[in-house]
UniProtKB/Swiss-Prot annotation:
PROSITE patterns: RIBOSOMAL_L36 (PS00828)
Protein name per Swiss-Prot or TrEMBL: Large ribosomal subunit protein bL36
Pfam families, per the entry: Ribosomal_L36
GO molecular function: structural constituent of ribosome
Ribosomal protein among keywords: yes
Listed GO biological process terms: translation
Record-level GO cellular component terms: ribonucleoprotein complex; ribosome
Family: Belongs to the bacterial ribosomal protein bL36 family.
Record keywords, A-Z: Ribonucleoprotein, Ribosomal protein
Ribonucleoprotein keyword on record: yes
SUPFAM superfamilies found in the cross-reference section: Ribosomal protein L36
Top-level taxonomy: Bacteria, Pseudomonadati, Pseudomonadota, Alphaproteobacteria, Rhodospirillales
Amino acid sequence: MKIRNSLKSAKLRDKNCRIVRRKGRVYVINKTNPRFKARQG
């Protein structure tokens, strides 16, 4: 999982990327290709 300042570029890396909010943190998850996971930090 990458920790990034801006998730906009992380979201655009793959068409299956979704932005989710969990416990006050913003995540990018990708069910089909989990290597695109990221968290905003």
